[in-house]
Amino acid sequence: MTKSVYEFWISQGKDKLRLPVLPDQLSISNTVQNETVKVAKFGDLTFIDEQGAKEISFSSFFPKKYSPIAEYQNFPSPENAITKIEKWMKAKKPVQFLITGTKVNLTCSIEGFSYSEGQQDIGDRSFDIQLKEYKTASPRKIKQKKKTKAKRPSKAAPKTYTVKKGDTLWDIAGRFYGNSTQWRKIWNANKTAMIKRSKRNIRQPGHWIFPGQKLKIPQ
């Protein structure tokens, strides 16, 4: 009998089991966990989620003796094969399910395993097995942005104005502020220098300014 190009392997670490007899049928289901939400005026809205885990199921048997239906010789006894699978289940660790010649190579959990007296020969063990793709949740790393201290706006340096012949603080204020009544801002910013220049500014604040004199114009 011509042997199949496919080999079914189940392993956990270095402990491996190759199925002696290939199943007649292999079922692999793949679902998407979509969520449907009812929204007023819009009806049903479906949000497509990530692809769900694959589920694999098949049936076969562990032969007691070699026959042409077996894929290879010197396979483990039905008792040893069953013990191996049950040991993997008790370990609560995933197994690797591989089918050579295909793209099937999945890390799985054993969801169900049952066996019974075989229907071929005495000593054979028929079995059903259900596997589910095992996915680990990897936490996403979120980079936390460092808070930067807001820079306080620096005070703008006051402008300077060189007094011309005929200027008054009243006129200068009207020119820079559009409001001549703001002349006291210029006076307060230059009071010390103006009094130093002419003591008459004590009695008549801001009245005495001179051509060539530099005045600070505050913002």
UniProtKB/Swiss-Prot annotation:
SMART domains: LysM. Pfam families: Dit_like (PF21821), LysM (PF01476). Residues 138-154 have a biased composition (Basic residues). This is Phage-like element PBSX protein XkdP. InterPro entries: Bact_Kbp (IPR052196), Dit-like_N (IPR048494), LysM_dom (IPR018392), LysM_dom_sf (IPR036779). Residues 138-158 are annotated as: Disordered. It comes from Bacillus subtilis (strain 168). Residues 159-217 form the LysM domain.
